[in-house]
From Swiss-Prot:
One of its GO terms (biological process) is endocytosis. Residues 136-156, 231-240 have a biased composition (Basic and acidic residues). Residues 136-157, 174-272 are annotated as: Disordered. It comes from Arabidopsis thaliana (Mouse-ear cress). Residues 243-252 have a biased composition (Polar residues). GO terms for cellular component: membrane. Gene3D superfamilies: Pleckstrin-homology domain (PH domain)/Phosphotyrosine-binding domain (PTB). Residues 253-272 have a biased composition (Low complexity). One of its GO terms (molecular function) is ATPase-coupled transmembrane transporter activity. The lineage of its organism: Eukaryota, Viridiplantae, Streptophyta, Embryophyta, Tracheophyta. CDD domains: PHear_NECAP. It holds the Pfam family DUF1681. This is Uncharacterized protein At1g03900.
């Protein structure tokens, strides 16, 4: 490989994320080992605002803070594989703020506060860093897999011909399965010489002796009205109290008794 190809391979970069506007703060020194809180950062401590780019350079990931107009580099944070927590630390009281460890490339470093305007931008920032870690892990697994396959190479013997030659046969002994009780009873019933007796079924229940009443005739039917009048006459003829002429003959006359009572009363009054 020539020197130019090595230089191109070293300078190969892949941009993972671009955020147009971020803010950088001068943060006070950490007093406890718990972490940083963005609530302690003052608005007057804001020292810079510009563009953020997350760039993948082979195994290393770089967080670059650049000028939005000119593209000049303000600061850079280098994230080594497997050591993300040493370079990028999230704030304890907000998901939009982080603390970056910036390096000048000569062994000097400092800690600054990084703030995103929107929560989804901070989420994309975390996703970009995680994607780079996964990419580096896959590349390492691929390299180790290739080396292990080359070291553990096994010669495969040619396939053996197991086909039968002319005149050869195969004998297979099959053990009969034991019959269960249900299948034995069924087979015994089917193998019997006698004819199977038909099942005696009970006769269906008789219908109840209920007769339906005939439908009434229409009200204006002349035949129905004539039958009704004849029936009324017949019923009156058969009633014992319908003819009272015989009783009137046997009853005493009320006219004579009434006249006798009236004459007796009159005579009694005159005598008084």
């Amino acid at each position: 490989m020539s020197f130019e190809e090595e230089e191109e391979e070293e300078t190969f970069e892949h941009t993972l994320l671009v955020v147009r506007e971020v803010s950088v703060y001068k943060i006070p020194p950490r007093t406890t080992s718990g972490g940083y809180k963005c609530g302690e950062w003052l608005q007057s401590d804001k020292i810079w605002s510009g563009r953020l780019r997350v760039v993948s350079c082979k195994d290393r990931c770089e967080i670059r803070l650049e000028d939005s107009n000119s593209g000049d580099l303000f600061a850079a944070c280098f994230v080594d594989p497997g050591r993300r927590e040493n370079s990028v630390e999230p704030s304890l009281d907000s998901s939009r703020y982080f603390v970056l460890r910036i390096d000048d490339g000569r062994g000097k470093y400092a800690f600054i506060g990084l703030g995103f305007a929107e929560r989804n931008e901070a989420f994309d920032f975390n996703v970009a860093l995680s994607d780079h870690e996964k990419y580096v892990r896959r590349e390492k697994e691929k390299e180790t897999g290739e080396t292990s396959e080359s070291d553990n190479h096994i010669d495969i013997h040619p396939a053996v011909n197991h086909r039968l030659k002319e005149g050869e046969t195969i004998r297979i002994n099959v053990k009969p399965k034991p019959t269960t009780n249900g299948t034995g009873m069924l087979s015994a019933a089917l193998s019997g010489t006698g004819k199977p007796k038909p099942l005696a079924l009970a006769p269906p229940p008789k219908a109840a002796g209920v007769t339906r009443s005939p439908l009434p005739p229409p009200p204006n039917d002349p035949v129905a009205s004539r039958i009704a009048s004849d029936g009324c006459k017949e019923s009156r003829r058969n009633e014992p109290l319908s003819d009272l002429s015989q009783l009137k003959k046997n009853l005493p006359s009320t006219a004579g008794s009434g006249s006798s009572k009236s004459t007796g009363a009159a005579s009694g009054w005159a005598a008084f």
